[in-house]
């Protein structure tokens, strides 16, 4: 490999940290300033530049320049400032870069761009993108349901890139072993189709047999090329997400973050709340506000946990209610998704069914103790709704977890104030600490970043053949043991600043459960050791 190729390869490049011996051996003499820096000095210099950027969007652009030139330095810096950088590198700032991707495009970032019109190119595309790297983890999106901002076509590749950044920063998954993938199946966003600078296919989305055939071919090819692959589905539309997951979850090690990941972290937050009150999950009434992939997935996860705690499936479903655009879901509605149908009620059981299009009326009628918002409908959790929740139970669980910030159902501060500090709160974006009547309430972030990195690390370390419900349950339980139930105002989820420790605990729980179920192919029998041995550190 030639000198300039090394300097242009982000997996190999050290920049000014190449030693004199390395510069001599690699033909780099005279191509770098004479001073040899440590990674600490490089990070100090880079962070100083970062602080000069006036907006989060410009800060993200700067950090992506580092990412594109030196992965090790990028992750060293990210680990050092993980709480500060997370909302810049990922949600919410990434939404702005996705919306402007075609106009800001500079570097493909070793992503694989799959074109639904050319299935014959899948093999070549994946091999070209991977090069000589052994890929263990793929995050793939078709970008139909990005981060509450909708359909962004090829531009959604940034969500795959961003997700993998969190995998590495939080759990130490080797960045050379990951591959971001986007399936360009078209887009229904008119502004993209009419933009001559849009870099994706200028066609409306393709659905049905052609779409599923392409996905099948992608999965088969990826599994063939990368035999130890863990496949993560991200931000697929509600019409396809559950179908795809159900097609593959009993065949390969795979995971859908929107359907499963959010459910795990919300369940962990519920466990954290119930640890404080001493109540049982099977005594709760759950209201899902927003019946898309995330909302239905969370409800499904909590339902599965109720069943594991002793209820029959039918008994457990009686504890659940779901509201979507048409109001409370009834089984006579024609447009229910497969994921929504189990939660739909019989209209005849509710004499005021016609009034069940309003959240407040539903809360007063079905008397939930848990309210989770995934609607992206800002302001939906009004003061009256919060007060009605408090009338149902002494300490309600209220999680407005829609993101980005402008899509939240309410703010944590409003929930604390309107509930007089009684409600347990977690939000989908960082909310910090809220002082109310002398108590500092630390607001947990129901951020999937607490769960999916560790889950992935556990899957890779154990070389698990499948991701089972039991392994997912183990991940959720591992979260709940990390909060302090005796501290007033304590968060119901561990703060993101501890995500590295959280990820190790989640990984160990998942790997050990896989081992118990006889699903591991790793030669290592000590799963805690397997997890620690696999963890990658950003060092030269």
UniProtKB/Swiss-Prot annotation:
EC number: 4.1.1.101
GO cellular component: cytosol
PROSITE patterns: MALIC_ENZYMES
Catalytic activity: (S)-malate + H(+) = (S)-lactate + CO2
Binding-site list for substrate: 163, 448
GO molecular function, one term: NAD binding
Top EC class, one word: lyase
Subunit-structure text: Homodimer.
PANTHER family in the cross-refs: MALIC ENZYME-RELATED (PTHR23406), NAD-DEPENDENT MALIC ENZYME, MITOCHONDRIAL (PTHR23406:SF34)
Task of the protein: Involved in the malolactic fermentation (MLF) of wine, which results in a natural decrease in acidity and favorable changes in wine flavors. Catalyzes the decarboxylation of L-malate to L-lactate.
Family: Belongs to the malic enzymes family.
Protein name (Swiss-Prot/TrEMBL): Malolactic enzyme
Species this chain originates from: Lactococcus lactis subsp. lactis (strain IL1403) (Streptococcus lactis)
Gene behind the chain: mleS
């Amino acid at each position: 490999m030639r000198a300039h190729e090394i300097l242009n390869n982000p997996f190999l490049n050290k920049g000014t940290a190449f030693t004199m011996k390395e510069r001599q051996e690699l033909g780099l003499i005279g191509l770098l300033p004479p001073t040899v820096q440590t990674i600490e000095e490089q990070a100090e210099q880079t962070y100083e530049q970062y602080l000069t950027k006036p907006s989060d969007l410009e800060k993200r652009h700067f950090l992506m320049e580092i990412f594109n030139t030196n992965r090790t330095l990028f992750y060293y810096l990210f680990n050092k400032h993980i709480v500060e950088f997370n909302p810049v590198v990922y949600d919410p700032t990434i939404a702005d870069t996705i919306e402007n991707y075609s106009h800001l495009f500079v570097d493909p970032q070793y992503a694989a761009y799959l074109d639904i019109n050319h299935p014959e190119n899948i093999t070549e595309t994946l091999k070209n993108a991977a090069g000589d790297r052994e890929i263990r983890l793929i995050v793939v999106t078709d970008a139909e349901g990005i981060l509450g901002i909708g359909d962004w076509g090829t531009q959604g590749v940034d969500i795959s890139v961003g997700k993998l950044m969190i995998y590495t920063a939080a759990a130490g998954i080797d960045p050379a072993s990951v591959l971001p993938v986007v399936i360009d199946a078209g887009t229904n966003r008119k502004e993209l189709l009419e933009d001559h600078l849009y870099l994706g296919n200028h066609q409306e989305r393709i659905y049905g047999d052609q779409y599923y055939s392409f996905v099948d071919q992608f999965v088969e090819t990826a599994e063939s090329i990368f035999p130890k692959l863990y496949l993560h589905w991200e931000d697929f539309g509600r019409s396809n997400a559950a179908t795809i997951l159900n097609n593959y979850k009993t065949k390969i090690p795979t995971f859908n973050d929107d359907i499963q990941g959010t459910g795990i972290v919300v369940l962990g937050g519920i466990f954290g709340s119930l640890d404080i009150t001493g109540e049982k999950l099977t005594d709760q009434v759950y209201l899902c506000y927003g019946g898309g992939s995330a909302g239905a997935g969370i409800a499904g996860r909590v339902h599965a946990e109720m069943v594991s705690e002793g209820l029959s499936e039918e008994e457990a479903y009686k504890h659940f209610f779901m509201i979507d655009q048409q109001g409370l879901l009834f089984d006579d509605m024609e447009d229910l998704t497969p994921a929504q149908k189990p939660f739909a009620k019989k209209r005849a059981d509710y004499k005021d069914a016609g009034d069940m299009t309003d959240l407040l009326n539903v809360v007063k009628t079905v008397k939930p103790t848990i309210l989770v918002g995934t609607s992206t409908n800002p302001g939906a959790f009004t003061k009256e709704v919060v007060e009605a929740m408090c009338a149902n139970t002494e300490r309600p669980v209220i999680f407005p977890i829609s993101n980005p910030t402008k899509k939240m159902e309410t703010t944590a501060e409003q929930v604390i104030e309107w509930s007089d500090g009684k409600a347990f709160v977690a939000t989908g974006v960082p909310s910090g600490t809220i002082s109310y009547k002398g108590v500092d309430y630390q607001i947990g972030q129901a951020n999937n970043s607490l769960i999916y990195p560790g889950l992935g690390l556990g899957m890779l370390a154990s070389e698990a053949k499948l991701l089972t419900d039991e392994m997912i349950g183990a991940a959720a339980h591992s979260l709940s043991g990390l909060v302090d139930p005796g501290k007033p105002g304590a968060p119901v989820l561990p703060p993101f600043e501890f995500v590295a420790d959280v990820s190790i605990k989640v990984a160990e729980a998942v790997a050990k459960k896989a081992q118990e179920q006889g699903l591991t192919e790793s030669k290592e029998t000590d799963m805690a050791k397997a997890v620690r041995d696999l963890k990658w550190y950003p060092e030269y």
